[in-house]
């Protein structure tokens, strides 16, 4: 049924080639906040002319692209236990996803005389928008402005800890208190940029000549970011667990960066900048007289 729907959607496809887009590896690009897919089709042997063969091959390639995009969207993890395929059981989510696939952008196309190939996709923002209404606890909230006091954002450095990206993440203190989740964020902010920015780095977070208790802030991080990089783990249900002291700092911070989703998760840290001495990384922020429990 879904494949017949894709044939209908083909008629309304937004098709245009954008300069500068090269062929890309298909998949869910969490660190780029988008989905990339490839569609291909072979020209039918019975085509009346070479022009007709190319047109029919392109049509088949676009349908293949849409089919592949649908599979990718269905596989997007909403949380540790749920995917978008589960959410698409609801009519409003399925209709929204179908509309997104119908309006997919074609970034690049090629024709070698036999096979027509098209690359396209869309931002994960569209996926978040489709599923937002079904996420428990997500609601419209007043978004505060950062006025230079306290920490402006949160960085969770998981190092080598296995982490599977999802639309929703959950953060708890070591004692079990919920610190971050959909119930803490503004829905519009969630749709626009997601609950967190995801970064992957291949370098080691710790310089080889530094003692283990010396750490630094990623070079790309904001000056007033609260960076937590040690005594951090994943629990059995896929939640990120941080020290109680770090959780207290988040809750007492003068700017609630959770509401506008000013959170970053990295699997490894980039180049070091500065040195800090605490069992979790904690930068002194404007408006705080001293770091809490270093």
List each language-model region with its residue ranges.
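Bacterial N-terminal signal peptides
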Residues: 4-16
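Domain-level marker for long, solvent-exposed, non-transmembrane regions
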Residues: 18-294
